[in-house]
């Protein structure tokens, strides 16, 4: 009876041992060098005939509890930190030889500890054995080498193909977003940029495509006339804002420009290069055209009275700039004044300028947003507000001595500030000013 019990216990223990070996082998199949950082290469020699399961079982069995729970091989395999252990066995003259490969995603120190632990194994199955670590390979170095070689091959195949640069891709996305910013303005639902409702200056173009092109290049204060008949919204805006007419460089653009100059209060005129349309201009061409804008009064006079084209006017202006070179000052002899002769100097004509407010004028000019400054008599800033909130700010603050803002001085604004006792009103431009109180000095930046 005792013998039977001993045989059964032996069979059960052997069964458990085989199951452990199988479990270790199946766990080893979870990782196939996918996230491996290092590979431990080892060689073994056993004084007898052994098989692969014997070697795997020895590795798991004899290192169990040796390095603590954190570096236990079974736990490391369950969490994927140790990969599938590969073993090759060869038998010769009653002895077994082979190699062991252990993939590791641990760090260098922990991998070295695991490698050293393998060398403590002294038995494989029933036989004495010896394991020696040959090397630890850094898989990432091999991957880097592969990446370099493969990248060279890919580059050779793509070298002749046009690959968009990152900047081009970014610009494409920006353009798509800007196109979504298009709004409809006024009763006529004119295509316009998002800044048209509150911007002090606007650009009037011919059609929707022109507004879209300007939007793509970051210009958000454009509005289209949409046809040869100028809408009432454009006429009304021209009386309240600083308006630049920006038309195509063809016959149609010239006709629309003439109509705009006749029915609207245009301040500046810009044209696309001859033969080109605004909708097809590049950013560089748009900026160059807008920088070369000509005052509307000059264009009106030359266009209607002298019959010159816009481009002739621009060429003449450029020619005048080249001719106006600084000449050397010729020293003229000073007139001799007799002892009894009186020197009569002309009395200076008083100019209405913004002396004493230069610092504040530059401040509003250089601001990214249109702002207004409210000053007291000692030139201290009482309030700094957006130009659209100027009227309410004047109404809410007492003791305002001067108002300086980057916007258009209108009759309504003059009436409001004069009622509050303001002495100085300084702005970018005047528009339709009919009456001006004696106590109020109205000054533009140009003055």
From Swiss-Prot:
Name the Enzyme Commission number(s) assigned to this protein. Answer: 2.7.7.101
The record, for PROSITE patterns, names: TOPRIM
> What residues does the Toprim domain cover?
200-274
UniProt cofactor note: Binds two Mg(2+) per subunit.
Q: Per the UniProt record, which residue ranges are transmembrane?
A: none
Q: Which cofactor does it need?
A: Mg(2+)
Keywords, in A-Z order: DNA replication, DNA-directed RNA polymerase, Exosome, Magnesium, Metal-binding, Nucleotidyltransferase, Primosome, Transcription, Transferase
Top EC class for this record: transferase
Q: Name one Pfam family in it.
A: Toprim_4
User: According to its UniProt record, which protein family does this protein belong to?
Assistant: Belongs to the archaeal DnaG primase family.
Q: How does it assemble?
A: Forms a ternary complex with MCM helicase and DNA. Component of the archaeal exosome complex.
Q: What is this protein called?
A: DNA primase DnaG
| Organism, as annotated | Pyrococcus abyssi (strain GE5 / Orsay)
Q: Which gene encodes it?
A: dnaG
């Amino acid at each position: 009876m005792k013998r039977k019990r001993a045989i059964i216990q032996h069979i059960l223990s052997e069964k458990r041992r085989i199951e452990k070996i199988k479990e270790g082998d199946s766990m080893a199949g979870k990782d196939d060098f996918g996230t491996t950082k290092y590979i431990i290469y080892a060689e073994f020699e056993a004084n007898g005939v052994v098989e692969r399961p014997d070697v795997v079982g020895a590795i798991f069995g004899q290192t169990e509890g040796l390095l603590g729970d954190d570096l236990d091989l079974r736990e490391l395999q369950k969490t994927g930190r140790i990969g599938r252990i590969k073993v090759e066995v060869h038998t010769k003259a009653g002895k077994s030889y082979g190699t062991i490969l252990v993939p590791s995603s641990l760090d260098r120190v922990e991998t070295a500890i695991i490698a050293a632990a393998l060398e403590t194994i002294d038995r494989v199955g029933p036989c004495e054995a010896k394991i020696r670590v040959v090397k630890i390979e850094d898989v990432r170095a091999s991957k880097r080498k592969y990446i370099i070689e493969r990248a060279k091959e890919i580059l050779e195949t793509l070298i002749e193909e046009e690959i968009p640069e990152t900047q081009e891709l970014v610009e494409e996305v920006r353009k798509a977003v800007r196109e979504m910013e298009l709004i409809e303005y006024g009763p006529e639902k004119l295509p316009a940029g998002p800044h048209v409702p509150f911007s002090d200056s606007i650009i009037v173009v011919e059609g929707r495509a022109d507004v879209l092109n300007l939007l793509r290049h970051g210009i958000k204060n454009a509005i289209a006339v949409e046809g040869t008949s100028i809408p009432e919204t454009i006429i009304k805006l021209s009386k309240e804002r600083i308006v630049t007419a920006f038309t195509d460089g063809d016959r149609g653009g010239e006709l629309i420009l003439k109509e705009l100059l006749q029915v609207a209060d245009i301040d500046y005129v810009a044209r696309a290069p001859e033969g080109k349309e605004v909708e097809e201009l590049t950013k560089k061409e748009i900026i160059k055209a807008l920088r070369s804008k000509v005052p509307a009064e000059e264009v009106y006079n030359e266009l209607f009275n002298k019959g010159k084209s816009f481009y002739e006017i621009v060429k003449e202006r450029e020619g005048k700039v080249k001719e106006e070179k600084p000449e050397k000052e010729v020293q003229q002899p000073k007139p001799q004044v007799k002892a009894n002769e009186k020197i009569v100097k002309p009395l200076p004509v008083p100019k209405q300028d913004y002396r004493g407010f230069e610092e504040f004028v530059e401040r509003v000019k250089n601001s990214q947003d249109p702002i207004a400054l409210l000053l007291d008599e000692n030139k201290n800033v009482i309030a700094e507000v957006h130009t659209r909130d100027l009227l309410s700010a004047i109404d809410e603050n007492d003791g305002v001595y001067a108002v300086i803002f980057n916007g258009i001085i209108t009759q309504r604004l003059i009436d409001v500030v004069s009622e509050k006792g303001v002495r100085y009103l300084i702005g970018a431009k005047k528009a339709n000013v009919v009456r001006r109180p004696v106590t109020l000095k109205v000054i533009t930046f140009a003055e």
